[in-house]
Amino acid sequence: PQTVKASSNMKIVLTSDNKSLDEVIVTGYGNFKKSSFTGAAASMSTAKLSDVPSLSVEDKLSGNIPGVSISSFSGQPGAMNYIRIRGMGSINAGNDPLIVIDGTPVNSGNLSGFNDAQTGSGYNGSGTNALSTLNSNDIESITVIKDAAAASLYGSRAANGVLVITTKSGSAGKTQVDFRSDWGFSNMAINYRPTLDGDSRRALIYQGLKNYAYDNIDGTTDASAAAFADANIDDYAAKPENGWANWRDALFKNGSNQNYQASVTGGNDKTKFYASLSYANQNGIVDRSGLERMTGNVNVSHRFGKFKLDASTMISSMHQNSAMDGGASFAGAISSAVWFLGPSNAIYDKNGNLLTKTDGAYNNSYNPIYENQHMSDRTN
């Protein structure tokens, strides 16, 4: 520092002093600078989470932490995902990492009682896990511990790594109120395995019947081949009384999602607080599939003398409606009906009533729309 006499005309030039903040690693027994942490770990702040338009914490993690792979086996809203840290460690046993939220280990497997805890398969074709109950806006940071240090911190449960989640806490200063909301729509990104409409399919089969006549009936002429096709076409491509069926449009729709989040934080040198409420509602692209979630979070910290008291409460209520997306309830995957059933397999009768069964090779000829309306699953 330099002291000069005051004058009416002074020019002050400040030189820059570049300083960088060390990345912090949160473990089971304290916080460390990354430069001083000897284990294999990676951390991510909420700055990368806030602008990702997804209700799933796993979707926001995907591709942001080295060594962590996240894959989904279902497009069901709220469905659990596979989380693998440095690949699979076992063929028969579980490979899910331990999840620790604010120092408390939680169940990292499937929370649905009707499903396998590791694969999610079973009566409910999708399942759900603890991360589905979290509001990503409440997360301050996520640390992934990848090596043997995880087992030394948390025991054998951490053999597949640890996902350490730290939620937001209050800070001294003016009380700040934050509100954000977003809306969105979803549909099938790819027209997977396009199918023929009724007229095109009938014309193709008609030509196939004529070709069959040419190859297998002696003395076939153009007229007799056409007569053979006319006599047999309705056995393979009959037009229903109320028109051709469009199973893709009948089974799938445009999905939607809405998300509302409100939080308040503040405090002084002694007492700091953070509180939040959120509501999320997501409708899937299959009828009767969706997720409704409400969360509440309160973190309070108070210092008196040499002592410090931290109190944290997190409440979450979630309702998940599951269609037969991956094969469930002794029925096949509802998405496969698009390819098993054709335009000739009627959805409704001539009076517009939904048929219980339809002529086709799907689920012993049961109408998948009827099944979905009467066999969907609900997880609370």
Q: Model-predicted segments: where are they?
A:
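Short, acidic, small-residue-rich periplasmic hinge/interaction motif at the N-terminus
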Residues: Q2-S50, E58, S71, R180
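Short, glycine-/polar-rich solvent-exposed loops and beta-turns at beta-strand/coil boundaries
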Residues: T3-S8, S71-A79, Y154-A159, K253, ...
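Flexible glycine-/small-residue-rich
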Residues: L14-S16, I25-G30, S72, I85-G89, ...
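Solvent-exposed, polar/charged alpha-helical surfaces in well-ordered, non-transmembrane soluble domains
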Residues: S35, G39-A42, A47, L55, ...
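Residues embedded in well-ordered regular secondary structure
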Residues: S43, N64, Q76-N81, I91-I99, ...
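Non-catalytic regulatory/gating segments with a bias toward low-complexity or hydrophobic composition
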Residues: L61, V68, G103, I142, ...
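Surface-exposed extracellular loop regions of Gram-negative outer-membrane beta-barrel proteins
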Residues: L134-A150, A159, N257-D325, T379-N380
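Outer-membrane beta-barrel translocator/channel fold
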Residues: M318-F340, A346-G352
